[in-house]
From Swiss-Prot:
Organism: Pseudomonas aeruginosa (strain UCBPP-PA14)
Annotated InterPro entries: Flippase_ArnF, Small_drug/metabolite_transptr
Keyword tRNA processing assigned: no
CC annotations in GO: plasma membrane
Paired cysteines (S-S): none
Function of the molecule: Translocates 4-amino-4-deoxy-L-arabinose-phosphoundecaprenol (alpha-L-Ara4N-phosphoundecaprenol) from the cytoplasmic to the periplasmic side of the inner membrane.
Compartment annotation: Cell inner membrane
Protein name, as recorded: Probable 4-amino-4-deoxy-L-arabinose-phosphoundecaprenol flippase subunit ArnF
SUPFAM superfamilies: Multidrug resistance efflux transporter EmrE
Keyword terms of this UniProt record: Cell inner membrane, Cell membrane, Lipid A biosynthesis, Lipid biosynthesis, Lipid metabolism, Lipopolysaccharide biosynthesis, Membrane, Transmembrane, Transmembrane helix, Transport
Ranges facing Periplasmic side: 25-44, 98-100
Quaternary structure, from the entry: Heterodimer of ArnE and ArnF.
Length: 137
């Protein structure tokens, strides 16, 4: 049950961090450059998107702390790395971001995903029955 909580928390952290990245990108691309702040009124939707993205990062951190409570760091961190793939796919798929797919980006993201799968497959196969630093229930 604790491992399931860890996986759910890590997944929540990954999804929230991905949403935060997309929200920051969308909001910041619609705000004026800092040197123009004095002369322009910022778009409210963009400010709201940035504020929500910061909140999503905070929630992602809380999920991350919960994940670390129940999962080995290598396992949790590899899942968090999958957020790169999710952000890339969404940013290139959604017209609001004006991003594109490319062979080199897709290959790089594919390697990240392959790494996540490799790390988790090896750890599952070689997982010890008892972690030495934890007491048996």
């Amino acid at each position: 049950m604790n491992a399931l909580r860890g996986w759910l928390a890590a997944l929540g952290s990954m999804l929230l961090a991905s949403a935060a990245q997309l929200g920051m990108r969308w909001g910041m691309s619609r705000l004026p450059l800092p040197e123009a702040w004095a002369g322009q009124t910022p778009e409210r939707a963009a400010l709201l998107a940035v504020a929500l993205a910061v909140t999503a990062y905070a929630a992602s951190l809380l999920c991350w702390l919960a994940a670390l409570r129940h999962l080995p760091l290598g396992r949790a961190y590899s899942l968090l790395s999958a957020s790169y793939a999710l952000v890339y796919l969404l940013a290139a798929s959604l017209p609001a971001f004006d991003e594109t797919f490319s062979t080199s980006k897709t290959l790089g993201v594919g390697l990240v995903v392959l790494g996540v799968l490799t790390v988790n497959a090896r750890r599952t196969a070689a997982a010890p029955a008892h972690h030495p630093s934890r007491k048996a229930p």
